[in-house]
Structure formats: structure tokens, C-alpha cells
């Protein structure tokens, strides 16, 4: 007679294969990929990049048992089951990109960000400048200008007490908009304050909340520095740069810092990091009207107030191919005290690990310990 579970309320989880071949995206890619690749081969040497074709073909093999699987055994009940291999793609596969989003957010929450307030900064550039950000060197220069400006704005809002100041941030580079359109912009998850102290000293964290006036001044500073950077690179001439700086409506620059997560809101911090690490394509937003018409919807209005876009299968593949990230480029980067080469990284991130361990042992309803504003 089979053994009865000691706790009848505990129902064992049953593994179910996700069956990607039943999804709309899989059927569209499977039916139209060969034709789409043939149309992109113009017979004069022009063809789809190898990386793009490889991403699509690996997606068609992801989760399919015929392309390989591993056998697993449940240690509790002894039941055997098989798990299909995944493609581990970075741009197309909804399953792999979503899993990477969840793992990234969990890692940053549990092992990187200490229990301190976090603010999200989102920077978007005008279209005429945005298209030049495919240059990795220029992209890095824009990021450094943004972070130096924010650090300077935070430092100016503090009383002068001497000593060096440091920020801590993780930058996510998004190359997409809500309607699968190309839109390169930056999401910065930054500890909302500065750390004071020299390299050989323990750090003291000081929380900073900028006023609306200080935020507006910071936005003007960021716009000026980035425009001058483009002028120095020869992308804009001096007159064009000055006109963008003097524009009354921010000249197409957008800086949003309205989202702030409190220090003791661990779930909110993880939700924010999931949002920052989200993939370009959301499978649940794709609908099919007929075999030749697809609709992709956005949660927020896109360019011109659009909330959806009508696409043919080949147009969908065009948009997905354009959003595949370049190889050997990081999707997120660490800055300040969270940077790999920072002498303070181990001390700051140790707080995240300590808080993660404490939360496993205690209920989240308890008051958090006051470690964020003491010496790190």
C-alpha cells in the first residue's frame, strides 16, 4: 500500500513540460523563418547575420525533447522525469529571457543591493542622438556623463563635511520600446544616497532626497554635458548643440526619477529590478488576427500614442532580429561601490547577503536592523 503523506495540506508539485511548440510565436517563427531568411539573401553577398539566424534556429530547438533532454529523479518520491534542453538565448526565446530576468533580479536583491533605499533613473535621448549610441565607446561616454552628473547633484545637496563620496548603481541598457521598436535608453537602479569615506576607512551612508528644483537643475546639467559630448565627437556642430541646450522643452531629453523603493521593501526592490532586467518581447502581448496579420500590444502608449502595432509575420521577425543584443556585451553594468574593482564592494554587498540570511530566519514583518545608515 502506498505511503500516505504526513501532511495532507502539502500537495507535491508535478513537473509539466512547457510545450513551446504550442505558442503563437513558435508557430510563426517555424512557418516563416525559411522564407524570411531567403528574402534577406539578395544574391549579392548580403544576408542575415550569423548571430541572428543562430538565435532563431536555437529558439526553435529550445524545450523540444527531440533536440536533447536530461533525465531527472525526484529524491522524495523516486519519480523519474525528463527535462528538455534550453537554448539560453539572449534576445528571442521568451522562456530563457524571462528566466534570466528572474535570476538577475534575485541575485541583485540577495547578493548585491544592501537594505537601503533605491531609486530608478531612466534616461532617454533625442532620436537624432539615439541612433549614434550603437557605438560602444560613445555609449560608455554617455553613461559616465550621466552617472557623474547624478553623483555631483547628490553631493551638492549635502552639507560640506569633507571626505570622498561614492555612489552605488547598476545600469541596464535597453535597446527596445514597448512596441518592439528600436529605442536605446538607460535604466539605472541606484542606491538613493551617497557613501562617505576614504578607501582605507569604513563607509558611512547618507540618504539623499532631491527637491523638484534640484531635480530640474540636474536634468539641465545632464542635457548640457551629453550635448557637449556629441559636439566634441563631431556629431553635432556648435550651433546645433547650443540650440538643443536652449530648447524650452528639454530638446527631446527625458530624465525620470520618480520611482523610489524604501529600504525595508525587499519585494518592491526585486520587482523594480525585474522591470529593469525585463526582456524585449512579452509573449502574452502577441495576438493573431489571421494567418497574415499579428497584433502586438503595449502596456503604455508608444510613439504617437500607439498602444498596439499591426504586423505581418515577416515584419515581426524583422523587429525581433533588430532587438537581438550584440554579442560579448553586458546587459547590465555595476558602478561606484558596486563595481567589481571597488575596494568597498565586498563590504557593501556583504550587507545584502547578511540581510538575505536574516530574512530566511525571520518574518518580514519584523523591523529591519539599522545597518544601512551606520558604518559599512
Which residues are covered by each model-predicted region?
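Beta->alpha loop/short-helix hinge microenvironment recognizer with preference
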Residues: 1-373
